[in-house]
Structures are given as structure tokens and as C-alpha cells.
Amino acid sequence: MLIPTRIKLNKSSQTLELGYADGQHFALPAEFLRVHSPSAEVQGHGNPILQHGKLNVAITQVQPSGNYALKLTFDDGHDTGLLTWNYLHQLGTQQAQLWQDYLAALSAAGQSRDPSESVVRLML
């Protein structure tokens, strides 16, 4: 298990910064963490539920959960789902691919990252 040696919430950039003893460093944006929350609300019960409109979401609180995870609270009220050390490290190492997959899923579903935007598909 890779446990971060440094955890910092950068409020100005809304990123959770994780540093590891081996020199790895990840900066995970709030939106990325929100749409990849391990909660049942996001992951469903075997069928992930696509999150949209989370462009401006912010992390309001970071709390340790025992010696194995973090609990994040977001300003949209979401506060369920524990991000284990292993899951956080996985998000960091796979961030680029996970983000591209998320953007592709949004596009395929006709959804937007922007909560003030609705995507309209014309049937021609």
C-alpha cells in the first residue's frame, strides 16, 4: 500500500496534492475527484452513474478516515465514499486516461461539465 507522506488541499487551484516517499507527486483536481468518487452514488451498484455539471465543484473539507483513507466533502453536498490510499494512488497514476475516458463518456451521453449548459442534439 502506498501511503502519501504529504497531503495538501490547494484551495486556490482546487487540487488535492499528494506526495510520496518515492518522489511521486500528483495534483488531483476537485472535479476529477468528484466524478471518480468511490461512493455508491457515483459508482452505482456495479453500473457507474455518469456525473455531469461538476466543472466548478470545490472541496470544502478533507478528513482522514482511520489510517487507510480520506473523506472529502464537496460544496455540492457530496460527502460519501472513502478514497483509500490505494485508490488515490490509482487515480494519480491513471489520471490522464481516466480523464479522457470521462470526457468521452460525457460527449457520448450528450452531457456537459458545465452545470449551466445543456447539450442539445439535433435530429436531422
Task: List each model region and its residues.
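Motif-centric detector for short Cys/His coordination patterns
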Residues: 1-124
